[in-house]
Amino acid sequence: MHQPNPIDIAAKASGEPVFREVGVGPWAETHLGEPRPDDPQSPNYDCRFDSSLLDEGDRRNVLDRYRYWTVSAIKDDLDAHGRHDFEVAVENWTHDFNIGSMVRTANAFQAKRVHIVGPHKWNRKGALMTELYQHVENHPSITELVECWKLRIAGEIAAAQSQASAIALHVHENAESGHGAGMNDAVSLNEGRVTECAPSGMLMDVPAASGAENGNKLAYMTELAAIDQRIAELKAARVIALDIIPGAVPMETYCFPKRCLMLFGAEGPGLSEKALELADDVVYISQFGSVRSINAGAAAAVSMHAWIAQHAAPQS
């Protein structure tokens, strides 16, 4: 347990201010008479719970539903619920103190990945340990990062196309064997077909494999349309540099692609010339005062939330 800060002690001794309690105390105090969930003999046993947190309480910066959970359990749950399609990259050439804040924001908005460009050692202070719940990757240069990211996108497109091909092949085989008679002309996706995904001579206005087993024609259309939409989103993926420079596009009018990589620079110098060169788009936040730029961590938060406002459902 960390020792209280002397300033916090003095503030409490003064009687002002009164803060609400954050987190929970030891399990024995908050769940009187209830068996511990880390006891294998307990009917409430759950391997996600951390014994030390149950003993000492949990004051971490996590949502209440994750109280007492291990770090790995929280990370796995975030993965299971699905991370958002934007990724965040930060240039770490100046050991900027804002990087930790950016990583914390990426966690809050459920970014798919966080990329640190430059030295492996980065200023974690502002992250408040949230990097533990993220997929963080290191890259020696911005060029290597962008090349790696584009290859990953190409791989995701190929995987989706293979999935569509497998669906088409499955249905084709069922039709030939007599199990799917009439199936090929029962469903037509007149808009947004995945035409390039099918083996030669095989139409893609066919249902999905899981639907074929149930005879659900609506499921055929829905599943194939979802693959088609995913491929379109991946093909529209872009690398977006966030910096206020001549020729940049105002964020207020910019439509963020669903799949994208956001590049952020350091406080002061901003993004490197190579990052700006490799970006598909350069976007800036409109400002109306005398200051040349806003804090790098704040700019990153505004940018990520702009994506959230366009693509994510509100959360309570």
Q: Residue spans of the language-model regions?
A:
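Post-transcriptional modification and biogenesis factors for structured RNAs
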Residues: 1-316
